Swiss-Prot record:
Protein name: Short neurotoxin OKI-Ed
Function as written in the Swiss-Prot or TrEMBL entry: Binds to muscle nicotinic acetylcholine receptor (nAChR) and inhibit acetylcholine from binding to the receptor, thereby impairing neuromuscular transmission.
Entry-linked InterPro entries: Snake_3FTx, Snake_toxin-like_sf, Snake_toxin_con_site, Toxin_cobra-type
Species for this entry: Laticauda semifasciata
GO cellular component: extracellular region
Tree of life domain: Eukaryota
Family the UniProt entry places it in: Belongs to the three-finger toxin family. Short-chain subfamily. Type I alpha-neurotoxin sub-subfamily.
Alphabetic keyword roster: Acetylcholine receptor inhibiting toxin, Disulfide bond, Ion channel impairing toxin, Neurotoxin, Postsynaptic neurotoxin, Secreted, Signal, Toxin
Subcellular location: Secreted
Length: 83
């Protein structure tokens, strides 16, 4: 019985992948490429793109925010997928 319980605990930990955090790029526009680990529970990355008087602006980070009209948004759910 103890063996069965231990097996179930191990399988649960492996399946849930406890402690896992998503990693996303977070550099802005033409800055050097950097990434960061997202907060626990944040499982997506985003890339926002828009134009203003400075040219094309790109913002990257964790999550999937809501945006105003005229801003292109791409959300994804794999490691470093928002480049």
């Amino acid at each position: 019985m103890k063996t069965l319980l231990l097996t179930l605990v191990v399988v649960t930990i492996v399946c849930l992948d406890l402690g896992y955090t998503r990693r996303c790029f977070n550099q802005q526009s033409s800055e050097p490429q950097t990434n960061k680990s997202c907060p626990p529970g944040e499982n997506s990355c985003y890339r926002k793109q828009w134009r203003d008087h400075r040219g094309t602006i790109i913002e990257r980070g964790c999550g999937c925010p809501t945006v105003k009209p005229g801003i292109k948004l791409r959300c994804c759910e794999s490691e470093d997928c928002n480049n």
